[in-house]
Amino acid sequence: MKKLCTIITILILLSTTISISNGRESNTLQKKNLPDSFSWKNIDGADYTTEVKDQSPAPTCETYALCASLETLMQYQLQEQYEPDLSECHLYFYAGGSYHAGYVNLMDAADYLIDFGVPDEGCYPDPHRAFDYPFESLPGWENRTVKISEWGWVELETEAINSALIEYGPLVMCFSVYEDLYTYKGGVYRHETGKRVGGHVVTIVGYDDNEGCWMVKNSWGSGWGLDGYFKLAYDADLFAEWYGPGTGVMYIDGVYGNLKPDVPKVYYERPIYGHTYLFGFEFRTIFRSLPFQRAAARKFGKLYAELETYNTLKVEFYVDDVLMFTTEDAPYRWKIAASYGNHTLMVKAYNEHNASLDIVDFHVFF
C-alpha cells in the first residue's frame, strides 16, 4: 500500500536501491532520506495502532504479530481509529498451526492472508488454552475477512527496515528471546544476562535514531514492559532467520476486504482468563502450578457473567454448549450456574445481521 499525505512528504528519493524479497514476487524499494524518528502511534497526532493483546498461555505469537500490523493498516486506510479486532486464533489454526508444534509457519500464515484472509475476533475468539482442541469459526466467516495482496522480507539493515516501516506499515519481526526480556521495565533493550529461552514474533511500529532503537509491540499484555511495548536497540543483533538467509523481518501490503463489518462485538468483563473470583471479589490467579487448567478462571461462590457489548440486540449464554440463558435487556449479565470442575462459558451476541462469540474456560470449586 502506498502511503499518502504526511508520510510521502517526509520521503526524498535517492538513487541507491534496497532489495526486498517478496513472498509471491520480487520487488525493490528506493533508499530514502528518512526522518530521525517515526511511529505508527503518531501520524499527525493520530495513533493507528490497536490495543495491546495477551496471547498467553498459547504459542500464537506469529498471528498476533500479523494481526497487529494488519489492524493498524486497516485503521490507516479508513483514516479512522475504530479499534478493529481480528481473530488471531482463526489465522493460527486455519493456516496450519498447532499448540503441540508450538508455532505456525509465518509464511503459511501470510499466504493464508492472501488466499483467504482473516475474520474478526467474534468469528473465533481466543479461549486462551495451552493445548490443541477442535476448532471452527462461525458460519459465514468468509464474508467478514480482511486480506492482503502481497508480503515479503525486508533486508536486515537498519535503514532498510526503517524505510519499509514508513512505506508499508508495521513490520513483523522474528527474534531470539533471552531471560532478561521477561523482566524488561523500560529503556532501550539489549540482551545482557540470562540464557536463550526460545523464539518470538512481534510487531515493529516505529523507530528513533536519537535513541538508536525500534519501538516494538509485544503480545504479552499491557502490564508488561512499556504498556505492552519495548524499545529494541538497533545493534541488539537478535533477528532470527528461521526461514532462510535474509528472513526475519516481514512486511505486508495491499489491505482490502470487509474492513468494518456490521457485526456485534462482545467481550467478557468477568470472568476472564488468569483471574480468580472469590464470592465476587476478583484478583489475578496465584498458585498457577496447581493441577488445574492453565489460565482458566477460577470460581469460588456466587459469580455473575458480565459483558462489554457494542452493536448488540440480544445475547445467549452457554455452558459446555448448552444454552442456559437468553436476554435482550442490557446490561447483559447472568448468574453463572455450573457444577464442580472445568467448564466452557460461551456468549453469543446478535445484531440485525450477524452474530459474534466470546469464550472463557473456568473451573468451579463451589
Predicted regions and their residues:
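Catalytic-core signature of thiol
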Residues: 25-270
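Disulfide-stabilized cysteine-rich extracellular repeat microdomains
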Residues: 18, 209, 221, 237, ...
